[in-house]
């Protein structure tokens, strides 16, 4: 029996786009500040989970909601289980969008919206692949279970809770990365660097009142703001002129304001996914490189000097001795993404590090402590820690997925590792598969995120063919 998978997708294009639009319109940024006992990760992620499960109920699948933090859509009765793993939460948005990030806009063949590429678009594509198999009543020998999490972009609380109470597949894929395949994922963790408060620190021409930047540990910060107390009014004009010259010659835009004995410096860079920080413009580290040339108070000078010297343009963690390289999994990446400094309070920087096999989290911690031993800091590992994950290229899952990719695209398939962390790493034999195609711009976690419409439909056909081959 020959199935024209692309034809089946084309027959469902309008339905797919409508469902995707309905899901995108839900602002599903994790929001524990407004969480409740019934919706612990916030109302948005819970609403998005319920919406996608509604699609499953409407289409005749078995569904299950686990405490509004995770759930699944299931089809088939086989003893073996094949897993699909997606997420309905999205990363925060900033003010640099050209359109409403939660109102899908189709322009020039692209669907612009937060979550269009990561991960609502690919998840809906994989869901429709599953639906096509059901609609065609194709014979299958395995149960297909599509598991949805609601805080993949942060601490994975939802999926961990799911794993505590539900049976997990041993094999499957997550539609949350790129083609041809991601069969290796680096270890991921964050290091919080806390600066000691120096008593009786000397004042400078300017005192650093605050330095703030960043939305999430896994996002390169798109804007940063420093507030300086002016101790020498004669220095302000030179500061302003130098700042204007600085933003003219660098990759950041800037704003300068003066009021009530203080100046406020704002830099605007470019947000990006922390797995590839080189594609962003880190507004905070750029701002630090400007401020480092000025005489600041003792606490402020120590903070700014450390950021400028050890964290600016250090995409691979070499300055902090966090670097290693693996033949298959590639190089370490490092990105300083959260900055929280107040003169009378905390003074912290959080770095997101993604490392291959060959170095451990404790090795990195010890190396960073040695490098920064004279900076008066303490360093701690915070949040969720993910270890490196690799499924060999010889695995039948990897071989089948690459075969399907090659047949649908005419392109050569090959194994690949990334610094991103997907739910694929949860499974013993789990990988990430699509939905971004080679040569496409990676706009995940960035303003004006988009998914090419044709790629969305092509990915759906690939998913349907691949899933069916693996469960028939």
Feature names for model-found ranges:
Residues 1-83, 91-93, 350, 455:
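N-terminal helical capping/dimerization or prosegment-like subdomains
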Residues 8, 27, 344, 399-470:
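Zn-dependent metallopeptidase/amidohydrolase metal-coordination segment
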Residues 58, 81-148, 152-154, 447, ...:
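Active-site metal-coordination/substrate-binding segment of hydrolases
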Residues 107-108, 130-145, 238, 296-302, ...:
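Phosphate-handling active-site elements
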Residues 119-120, 124-198, 240, 315-328:
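Acidic/histidine-rich catalytic neighborhood of metal-dependent amide-processing enzymes
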Residues 184-186, 190-270, 274-333, 360-376:
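Acidic-enriched catalytic cores of C-N bond-cleaving enzymes acting on peptides and small amides
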Residues 223, 237-253, 388-426, 430:
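Active-site-adjacent substrate-binding region
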Residues 272, 306-313, 340, 350-357, ...:
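A short beta-alpha structural unit
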């Amino acid at each position: 029996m020959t199935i024209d998978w692309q034809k089946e997708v084309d027959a469902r294009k309008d339905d797919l786009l409508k469902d995707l639009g309905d899901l995108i319109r839900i602002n599903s940024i994790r929001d524990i500040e407004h969480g409740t006992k019934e919706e612990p990760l916030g109302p948005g992620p819970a609403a998005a989970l319920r919406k996608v499960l509604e699609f499953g109920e409407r289409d005749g699948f078995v569904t299950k909601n686990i405490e509004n933090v995770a759930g699944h859509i299931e089809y088939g009765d086989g003893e073996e289980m094949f897993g699909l793993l997606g997420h309905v939460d999205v990363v925060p948005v900033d003010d640099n969008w050209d359109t409403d990030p939660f109102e899908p806009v189709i322009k020039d063949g692209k669907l612009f919206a937060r979550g269009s590429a990561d991960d609502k678009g690919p998840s809906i594509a994989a869901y429709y692949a599953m639906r096509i198999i059901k609609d065609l009543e194709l014979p299958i020998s395995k149960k297909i279970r599509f598991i949805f999490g609601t805080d993949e972009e942060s601490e994975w609380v939802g999926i961990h809770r799911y794993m505590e109470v539900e049976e997990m597949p041993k094999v499957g894929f997550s539609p949350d990365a790129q083609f041809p395949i991601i069969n290796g994922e680096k270890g991921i963790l964050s290091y919080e660097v806390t600066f000691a408060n120096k008593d009786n620190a000397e004042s400078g021409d300017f005192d650093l009142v605050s330095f703030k930047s960043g939305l999430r540990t896994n996002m390169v910060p798109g804007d940063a703001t420093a507030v300086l107390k002016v101790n020498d009014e004669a220095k302000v004009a030179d500061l302003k002129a130098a700042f204007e010259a600085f933003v003219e010659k660098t990759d950041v835009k800037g704003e300068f304001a003066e009021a009530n004995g203080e100046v406020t410096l704002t830099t605007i860079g470019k947000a990006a996914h922390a797995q590839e920080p080189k594609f962003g413009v880190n507004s905070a580290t750029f701002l630090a490189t400007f401020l480092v040339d000025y005489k600041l108070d003792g606490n402020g000078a120590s903070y700014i000097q450390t950021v400028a010297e050890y964290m600016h343009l250090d995409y691979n963690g070499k300055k902090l001795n966090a670097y290693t390289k693996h033949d298959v999994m590639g190089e370490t990446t490092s990105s300083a993404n959260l900055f929280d400094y107040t003169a009378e309070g905390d003074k912290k920087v959080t770095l997101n590090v993604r490392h291959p096999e060959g170095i451990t989290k404790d090795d990195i911690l010890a190396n960073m402590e040695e490098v920064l031993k004279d900076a008066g800091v303490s360093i701690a590992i915070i949040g969720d820690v993910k270890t490196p994950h690799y499924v060999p290229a010889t695995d039948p899952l990897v071989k089948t997925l690459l075969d399907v990719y090659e047949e649908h695209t005419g392109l050569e398939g090959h194994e690949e590792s990334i610094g991103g962390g997907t739910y694929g790493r949860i499974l013993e034999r789990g990988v990430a598969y699509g939905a971004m195609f080679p040569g496409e711009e990676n706009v995940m976690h960035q303003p004006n995120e988009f998914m090419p419409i044709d790629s969305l439909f092509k990915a759906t056909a690939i998913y349907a063919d691949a899933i069916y081959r693996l469960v028939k």
